[in-house]
Amino acid sequence: MTTFRFCRDCNNMLYPREDKEEQRLLFECRTCTYAEEAGTPLVYRHELITNIGETAGVVQDIGSDPTLPRSDRECPRCHSHDNVFFQSQQRRRDTSMVLFFVCLGCSHIFTSDQKNKRTTFS
């Protein structure tokens, strides 16, 4: 996580600057001459986390797809025990193996990490 750094002499914000001679990253005050070496070369990190890709491909007639496995997990919305499931398609470091269940009764999408009763797969 990137944080703001402040000058220990004048309390102004420090800005990143490259030391081209020694090829290192410094944080430097624009008001006084204070500078400190950065512990990491990371200045800014922008992570986009989206949930839209996880359920990509879910269509109205997903229940008629014979290639999808079926389970008897109870739907939290309509309590039906007829659903199909698939694994998350996201490929992020923080993504664990999450199964997405699609209820064939009400088309509700729910995940395997929600607390529920025992599931059997067929």
From Swiss-Prot:
One annotated GO biological process: maintenance of transcriptional fidelity during transcription elongation by RNA polymerase II
Keyword Ion transport annotated: no
Binding-site residues for Zn(2+) 2, renumbered to this chain: C75, C78, C103, C106
GO cellular component: nucleolus; RNA polymerase II, core complex
ZnF start-end (TFIIS-type): 71-111
Primary localisation category: nucleus
Residues annotated for Zn(2+) 1 binding in this entry: C7, C10, C29, C32
SMART domains registered for this protein in UniProt: RPOL9, ZnF_C2C2
Gene Ontology terms, MF aspect: DNA-directed RNA polymerase activity; nucleic acid binding; RNA-directed RNA polymerase activity; zinc ion binding
Gene3D superfamilies: 2.20.25.10
Pfam families with a match to the protein in the record: Zn_ribbon_RPB9, Zn_ribbon_TFIIS
Positions annotated as zinc finger (C4-type): 7-32
Isomerase keyword on record: no
Binding partners and assembly: Component of the RNA polymerase II (Pol II) complex consisting of 12 subunits.
Family: Belongs to the archaeal RpoM/eukaryotic RPA12/RPB9/RPC11 RNA polymerase family.
Task of the protein: DNA-dependent RNA polymerase catalyzes the transcription of DNA into RNA using the four ribonucleoside triphosphates as substrates. Component of RNA polymerase II which synthesizes mRNA precursors and many functional non-coding RNAs. Pol II is the central component of the basal RNA polymerase II transcription machinery. It is composed of mobile elements that move relative to each other. RPB9 is part of the upper jaw surrounding the central large cleft and thought to grab the incoming DNA template. Involved in the regulation of transcription elongation.
Protein name, as recorded: DNA-directed RNA polymerase II subunit RPB9
Gene: RPB9
